[in-house]
Regions:
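Low-complexity, highly charged intrinsically disordered N-terminal segments
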Residues: 1-48
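Low-complexity, intrinsically disordered regions enriched in charged/polar residues
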Residues: 5-11, 66, 177-181
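A broad "ordered helical/assembly scaffold" signature
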Residues: 16-18, 70, 80, 141
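Domain-scale recognition of functional cores that engage charged ligands
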Residues: 40-64, 75-258
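Conserved phosphate/anionic-ligand binding catalytic regions in large, soluble enzymes, centered on
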Residues: 69-75
Length: 258
């Protein structure tokens, strides 16, 4: 990892998670009888009815947008970033996730008169293709805030042997980006937080690049500012199709969200 430019923090993170997996530490398990469902979550409509709409743009002006874009679209037949997958046709043009994301940002900037910087958290597998899209878009411009940060990379591990896998014909396949939890150390080490604070931004709206519904919202920005909370998450009801991914529960002992 050090030969690939990874920091001490990245190496320590990987070592810790590897040891947890190898040792099957009990502390890494969440027992069903120790948690309870999350209830009484206010709806977006409820939030909309309670905010001061005159102040909402002020909160939105202090908000930046970060898209998690480190994963490949291999399950969809792509060997590039998932955000490059065409998802709709508009005026005889195929629109990709990334095109719609850029459109959402440009629309918010124009309609509300805010800067709304966009940063992609790319991986070593997605950076080149997605940055080419941003840099060749004649309408998208941004200064002072980086358009991308690069998350860490770590060796792929064989579930059977616990050892790094080997692909002599294509060594790049021996490496992968970590999961979304890598976000926190990446934004810390990249200097993104310092850059945002220097430009007066206080809030960071984060969502996956393939989640077009989770777009920046002045309503949520104002609600977040009103609560004074350090962290807020927007959730949706799970359906039978939502088999992948986790869900939010509350720790019975502490009330902490997990």
């Amino acid at each position: 990892m050090r030969k690939h430019g990874m920091t001490d923090m990245a190496i320590a993170q990987f070592r810790r998670l590897y040891e947890v997996w190898r040792n099957e530490e009990a502390s890494s398990w969440i027992r069903e009888d120790e948690v309870e469902p999350l209830v009484s979550v206010p709806s977006f409509h409820d939030v909309y009815e309670t905010i001061n709409h005159d102040k909402a743009v002020d909160a939105f002006a202090k908000t930046a947008f970060l898209k998690l874009n480190g994963g490949l679209g291999t399950s969809m037949g792509l060997d590039c970033a998932k955000s490059l997958l065409p998802v709709r046709r508009h005026k005889a043009r195929q629109m990709r996730f990334i095109d719609i994301i850029i459109g959402q940002v440009l629309t918010a900037r124009t309609r509300l008169g805010v800067d709304l910087p966009l940063t992609l958290m790319n991986s070593f597998r997605t950076s080149k293709d997605t940055m080419k899209v941003l840099q060749t878009n004649k309408k998208f411009h941004q200064e002072d805030i980086p358009m991308e940060i690069i998350q860490h990379q770590e060796p792929k591990i064989s579930a059977e042997t616990g050892m790094p896998v080997s692909f002599p014909a294509n060594p790049e396949l021996e490496w992968c980006p970590p999961g979304h939890g890598d976000l926190f150390s990446t934004i810390w080490e990249s200097g993104l937080l310092d850059a945002l604070e220097a430009q007066g931004f206080k809030y960071l709206f984060i969502s996956n690049s393939d989640n077009l519904g989770a777009r920046p919202s002045r309503t949520l920005a104002q609600h977040f500012e009103n609560t004074g909370a350090p962290f807020m998450i927007e959730v949706a009801k799970r359906t039978p199709a939502d088999r992948k991914g986790g869900h939010i529960v509350r720790d019975k002992a502490t009330g902490r969200l997990m």
